[in-house]
Amino acid sequence: MEKQAEKQLEKQLESFILHLKRKTVVGSYQVSRASAELLRQWVHKGKWGNAKSLIDQIKIIGKKLMNAQPLEFCIGNIVRRVLFIIREEYLTFFRNKKNGLNNDDYDDDDFETTTSNNNNNNNNNNINSSSNINKNNKYSNVMLQDDPIDDQEDIDFTETFPRLKAAIMDSINELIDELEGLHRNVAEQAIEHIHSNETIMTLGCSRTVEEFLKEAARKRSFKVIVVETAPSLEGQKTAISLSKASIDTTLITDSAVFAMMSRVNKVIIGTHAVMANGGLIATSGTHTLAVAAKYHSVPIVVCTGLYKLCPLYAYDQDTFNNFGSPGEYLKFEEAEFLENVHSYNPTFDYVAPDLVSLFITNIGGHNPSYIYRLLQEYYDARDILEDE
């Protein structure tokens, strides 16, 4: 029975890796959700006897997933969160035993019930921000414990605790609940940041930004200027979606960004990843938008979930970038007349942190300078150092 379950897990892993390589699973949210579900199944059905064994297995799985799609930073982020959860739950049990406290709060089958409830509530995204803050504080207390991270090096995570699996499963379910509710949690803050008669500019196609603007439109009257984001033309999808929601929407070309920026009160965008220094890896064209906004002293607000928080650094436009086919904007028959021309189609832009005014996340607003603190609260330093 155990061998059959193990084979099934390996099959699921290989299938997901194949989907990542073929890009049949796309989008940071979908990839993050699928990664978290896979790791939950591995914790639930995998063969591991103690926390160290599980940590080693999750690291191996994480490397395989990240190698399959290196620029999907959210995969590594979810893996690091799960590793952080495993260590925190183990340390909780370890400290309780050390201090003579009871570790029998979890029933052996609690994780079965929690998993079932989680699956039944997939469509219930009405999770308020305060509840998510409380959940995250469960993992942020690493900075407040009696023994700091530096003193944990002598803990080998090999001791076994009967209730550990249930505790880890419960925490991973909370992580998945957080992913499910993040769009609503970000959107609930819209009224605080968008005021009547404002003109908002955005670009690309971000579900988080769309829901943020639609939520604000329920109580505010404002205009939205959408940059079409050539050559992918993702902005057209956003413009159509906002128009259907009865929001006054204007679609402009990328070249018109600077000319229109003087009329804008605020720029609201999404991002592919938030780097360790508070910079962004975002849709191509975002850097031009950000520079124009800074010139006109227009604040840039980034709507994102914290699952995009990445402990890596990007220093220029070439770091962590991908190049698409020039055929999207240059016809093949025209290429023969361009012998000495090199044509590039970058997928992403790097936006420096000094160009960003505010991050609106699923647990509230943060300045770019606060990102380093969030990294300490969400990831274990050992996993970050291993990535480097």
UniProtKB/Swiss-Prot annotation:
Highest taxon in the source lineage: Eukaryota
Main location: cytoplasm
Residue ranges with Low complexity bias: 116-133
GO CC annotation, single: eukaryotic translation initiation factor 2B complex
Function: Acts as a component of the translation initiation factor 2B (eIF2B) complex, which catalyzes the exchange of GDP for GTP on eukaryotic initiation factor 2 (eIF2) gamma subunit. Its guanine nucleotide exchange factor activity is repressed when bound to eIF2 complex phosphorylated on the alpha subunit, thereby limiting the amount of methionyl-initiator methionine tRNA available to the ribosome and consequently global translation is repressed.
Alphabetical list of PANTHER family matching this protein: TRANSLATION INITIATION FACTOR EIF-2B SUBUNIT BETA
Name this polypeptide is given: Translation initiation factor eIF2B subunit beta
Record gene name: eif2b2
